[in-house]
């Protein structure tokens, strides 16, 4: 569970854990505004979005005619990292996720001051193994910084 996972990370040496769903909410709301301003008004025929840096790089390289249709909003990783850095300026932010492409994203000039390290789940699992930490064996810690629970009720809410 997320609470057990948080405890295991703290035993490993992390001081706090934030759920990246917060950043996903921030991005979804920003992209909804972008959609309402550009697509709904007819300025753009469609809007593409992806949290995957590999997808974004591929689209820009092989489909340059659609660059204006690719959302430039922050990815969940970056939005969450910026929130953490804003609240805790001296914090070192480590993103943990399934994809090694996030390492490329973290090396971008505009991101490298926000995300200090990226670990894949496989790498984190190896760290747990090396320290003989079993996340399932810990007590539940329910205090995980989670999603915003922001749910706009209508398109009008998105335009505000």
Where on the chain are the PLM-derived regions?
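Iron-sulfur-associated redox domains of electron-transfer enzymes in respiratory
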Residues: 1-160
